[in-house]
Every structure is written in C-alpha cells, then in structure tokens.
C-alpha cells in the first residue's frame, strides 16, 4: 500500500468518527452565524505572480518534524504572502483543524490543505475560517459535486492535478483554480518539469497554482516563467534559518514575472505526452 493510499484510508476512518461526534447538520448550523470568507481568488489575481505560503508541522516526504509555531510563521507570512495554506491532516503531517482557526485571526485568505475525501471536510473548513479547500483529483469521489459544495459555502476550491487527464477533468467539472503538484503523491519525488509540461493546458481565464518544489528563488523564477499565476511554498520556508529573508528573496525573484502561458501546437502536444 502506498503512502497516499494509507493517508486516504486513515482520513476516511477519521472523518467517519468525527461525523458521529458532530453530525453534518450540526456543522451546517455553525455556518449561519459566520461572515463571508475572504476571497481566495481575488488574493491570487493581479499583474504579478502570487505567493501562497504554507504552514505544516511535519511531512512524510522529508521524514521531519518542523519546530516553528503557527503564530511565528503567520507573522512572517502576513508581510509577504497573498494567501496561506494550512495543512490540517494530523496523522502524517501533524496538522490540526485548530491551526486553521488560529490562522484565521490574521485576516489573510486561507487554504485548508488536506486529503479531502468527504463533503464533511468542506463544511469543516468553512466553519474553521477557510477561504478555499484543496480538492485532489482522484481522491475526492465526485469532483463536480465537491466544487459545487465549496461554492455554495462561498469558497473557491483549488483543484489539484497531476496529469493532462486530471486537468481536463478539472476543467470539465468547472474548476477555476487549477493546482499542479510537482510532487508525485505515490513516490513523494519532486519534478518541476511537471508544471512546465502541464501549464500550457490551462486556459488563460483560469488561475494556475504550481505546488511543491520551490526551495529557493531560482526554483520560483523557473516556475513563474512556466506560466504559473501563483506558487505554493511550504517546506523551504519551514526549514529556513531565516524564513523572512527567504520569502523576501522569493518575492524579489518573481516580482518581474508576469502571468501568462504558452500554448502547444498539435505536434508539440503529442511529443510532450507521447
């Protein structure tokens, strides 16, 4: 069993138990008193490449636990991030839905990053202050339904893709925020070429977020040059001796990069994906 399969099985069991303790109807009732969330899409829309900075306590890909606290990193991110991703999966990433609630105090659009396997988690995200939810193609059972549920709750989901087929499925389902994860979720290996290969398939009217693999300003510049509208950066910032300095360097690297993607000719497309 792969690490992805283990995580999915774990999340399904945990959400089943959570929904017994707090039924979905009870979660829905909590939403009636909440203000509208900040717009995640607006935060990523502009004339420059946007940055989504991530808070996570651990990562199975590195086998490490990160010692920096949420509030320490939020103080850094509020000075340069356009939005913040908060990992809430607890068993493998040591995350918590409470981190999302605490991060919502900073007035920055938040992405709940998790392995979403049930609409219960979408309601949970909204109740905890999220502006967006990560929905992974092939993990969430009904992509179109998941997108619709997010929008009913005034959130725009980030739909994560790993292949050309994933992108076409996401577009067909109505996704407006397309994420390309440079990390293979089965092997945990990173390849920035994935964004370069898949970016031309994303229409200009949609926003493309390149996820994972930015270890420094050079990587950020490469991905921005591939046509990413936004970069999601986590591990390098969590590991940096001075995350503020690294964030400044990344901001400077992408400052002059304008969003925009090339298009494949028919021959180029078939050569790329043959």
Swiss-Prot record:
EC number, as in UniProt: 4.1.1.48
InterPro entries: Aldolase_TIM, Indole-3-glycerol_P_synth, Indole-3-glycerol_P_synth_dom, Indole-3-GlycerolPSynthase_CS, RibuloseP-bd_barrel
Pathway(s) served: Amino-acid biosynthesis; L-tryptophan biosynthesis; L-tryptophan from chorismate: step 4/5
GO biological process: L-tryptophan biosynthetic process
Domain of life: Archaea
Keyword Lyase set for record: yes
Example GO molecular function: phosphoribosylanthranilate isomerase activity
Keywords: Amino-acid biosynthesis, Aromatic amino acid biosynthesis, Decarboxylase, Lyase, Tryptophan biosynthesis
Family of this protein: Belongs to the TrpC family.
HAMAP family assigned: IGPS_A
Protein name: Indole-3-glycerol phosphate synthase
């Amino acid at each position: 069993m792969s690490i992805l399969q283990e995580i999915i099985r774990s999340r399904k069991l945990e959400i089943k138990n959570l929904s017994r303790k707090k039924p979905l109807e009870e979660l829905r009732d909590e939403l009636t008193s909440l203000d509208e969330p900040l717009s995640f899409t607006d935060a990523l829309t502009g004339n420059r490449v946007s940055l989504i900075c991530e808070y996570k306590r651990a990562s199975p890909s590195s086998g490490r636990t990160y010692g920096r606290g949420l509030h320490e990193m939020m103080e850094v991110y509020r000075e340069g991030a356009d939005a913040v991703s908060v990992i809430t999966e607890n068993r493998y990433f040591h995350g918590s839905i409470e981190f999302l609630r605490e991060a919502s105090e900073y007035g920055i659009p938040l992405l709940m990053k998790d392995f979403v396997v049930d609409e219960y988690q979408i309601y949970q995200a909204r109740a905890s202050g999220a502006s967006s939810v990560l929905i992974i193609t092939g993990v969430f059972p009904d992509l179109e339904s998941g997108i619709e549920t997010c929008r009913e709750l005034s959130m725009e989901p980030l739909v994560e893709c790993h292949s050309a087929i994933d992108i076409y499925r996401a577009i067909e389902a109505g996704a407006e925020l397309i994420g390309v994860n440079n990390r293979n979720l089965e092997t945990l290996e990173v390849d920035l070429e994935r964004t370069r290969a898949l970016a031309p398939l994303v229409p200009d009217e949609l926003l493309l977020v390149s996820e994972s693999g930015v270890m420094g300003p050079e990587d950020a510049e490469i991905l921005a040059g591939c046509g990413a509208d936004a970069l999601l950066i986590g591990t390098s910032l969590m590991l940096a001796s001075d995350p503020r300095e690294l964030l400044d360097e990344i901001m400077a690297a992408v400052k002059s990069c304008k969003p925009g993607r090339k298009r494949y000719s028919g021959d180029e497309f078939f050569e790329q994906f043959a």
